[in-house]
C-alpha cells in the first residue's frame, strides 16, 4: 500500500527517513555521504515523485522504493 508522504506528520516523516537510512548500512560508493545528506536525498526523491513510501501488510514494515517498482500494483492504479 502506498502511503502519501504529504499525509505523514513532519516529525514522523523525519524519523522514518532516518530509520531507513540507518537500515541501508554503509555506502561504499566513490564518495561517502553524511547521514544528513542521505536523509535529505531520500526526502528529495519523495518530493520529486521518484520514490514512494510503501507499507507491507505481510511484513508489517514501511520502506521507500522507486515509484516504477510499484506502479500498476496498487488497486487504484497509483
Swiss-Prot record:
It holds the Pfam family UPF0270. InterPro entries: UPF0270, YehU-like_sf. Belongs to the UPF0270 family. This is UPF0270 protein IL0325.
Amino acid at each position: 500500500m502506498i502511503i502519501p508522504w504529504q499525509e505523514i506528520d513532519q516529525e514522523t516523516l523525519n524519523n522514518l527517513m532516518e530509520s531507513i537510512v540507518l537500515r541501508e548500512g554503509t555506502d561504499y560508493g566513490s564518495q561517502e555521504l553524511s547521514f544528513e545528506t542521505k536523509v535529505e536525498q531520500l526526502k528529495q526523491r519523495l518530493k520529486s515523485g521518484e520514490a514512494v513510501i510503501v507499507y507491507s501488510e505481510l511484513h508489517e514494515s514501511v520502506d521507500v522504493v522507486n515509484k516504477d517498482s510499484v506502479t500498476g500494483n496498487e488497486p487504484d492504479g497509483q
